[in-house]
Structure formats: structure tokens, C-alpha cells
Amino acid sequence: MASDMTYTLDTCICVKIVQNPNFVNLLKLYIDSENSSVYVNEQVIKEIQRKFGYEINHLLGHLKSSLGVDVFYGNISDKIESDAKYLLKHTSVHNGDAQILAFTRNTDSVLISCDKDLISIAISVGVSTINPDQLHTGNLEFQINKGRDRIAQTVEKISNQVKKPVKKITWELYTA
């Protein structure tokens, strides 16, 4: 975990945190509660209010208490808006995601999102990302790859002719 890290949450992450308290435990492994801060920007709040009806103060309070970090509301400035327009012209990102991505670039923060398309575009424009849907697979892949270093031994199948005939054991009940 790095010190003084800032993160920007996408809409899907905020919704997952509110709807699934266990999801936060996974994120806490990657967010240092002492040296990190989290941004939720204007676009994310608009999407959440439109789709789910969460109030801004309720959402920010819930995120702060769940994650244990400082959570800040970020406005979409004119500079961010012009960067979003640039991203719309030069990438395949849609308007809402363009604003979220432009905000992330402007704040030099790490984007946390479950949106695979947004993540791939963010990586292509040089933004660091975290996809919590793939965090749990890292250790499993490491364990699988670790086993490749061993030399595999070939085992030949034993033919039926080599096997010894076996008597079938039957159990009988004797009563007196």
C-alpha cells in the first residue's frame, strides 16, 4: 500500500459498497485507511441519485464509515469538462464515463471501477485502475503459476491384462 494515495470511485463501486457490506472488506485490502482519500465526483452522484435515489449526504457518510477513509465530493470543473470532450472524441468512452475518467486524470488518482470498458480506456490514456471484480483472482493465478515450475511425470495406464483378477467380497449375515 502506498502512502498518500487518492482514489476515484465509479458509480458501480459506490452502489456495490452500499448494497453489499462484505464488498468493502475486499476494497480495504487495497486502500490504506491512514494515508488515503477517496473522491466521489458530481457525475457519479448524479447517476446514483437518478438510478437509485440515494441522497448525497447519506452516500458520502456511508462510504466514509464503511471504508474508514476521508471521502470528498468533487465538482466537474470547466477544465475537466473540456478533457471529457477530448476523451469523447478520441476514445470509445460514453459521456458519463468520460467525465469520471477526466476527473480521475485531473486529480491524479486511481480509478476504482467494475466497468471493464472504462478500465481498458483508462489504462490506454495512462490512468491507474483497480477492478475489484478481479482482485480475488490474483492469488489464485499466482498459486496456479507457481505449480508450473515442477517437472511433470508421465504415468502410463495399466492395461487390464496386467491387473490381477480380484475376488468380489460379499458380506453375509449369519443368524442363529
Question: What is each stretch, according to the model?
Answer:
Residues T6-L9, Q19-N57, K64-I76:
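PIN/NYN-family metal-dependent endoribonuclease catalytic core
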Residues F72-S124, D149-A152, E156:
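Active-site neighborhoods of divalent-metal-dependent phosphate/nucleic-acid chemistry enzymes
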Residues E55-L59, T91, T129-N131, R148:
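Short, hinge-like loop/turn segments at secondary-structure boundaries
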Residues S3-T6, S36, T107-S109, V155-N160:
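Short coil/turn segments at beta-strand junctions that form active-site/ligand-binding loops
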Residues A2, K116-A176:
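Acidic, PIN/NYN-like endoribonuclease modules and their adjacent C-terminal/linker elements
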Residues C14, F23, I45, L118-I119:
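A generic structural signal for short hydrophobic patches within well-formed alpha-helices
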Residues L9-T11, K16, E42, I112-D115:
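Short His-Asn-centered micro-motif
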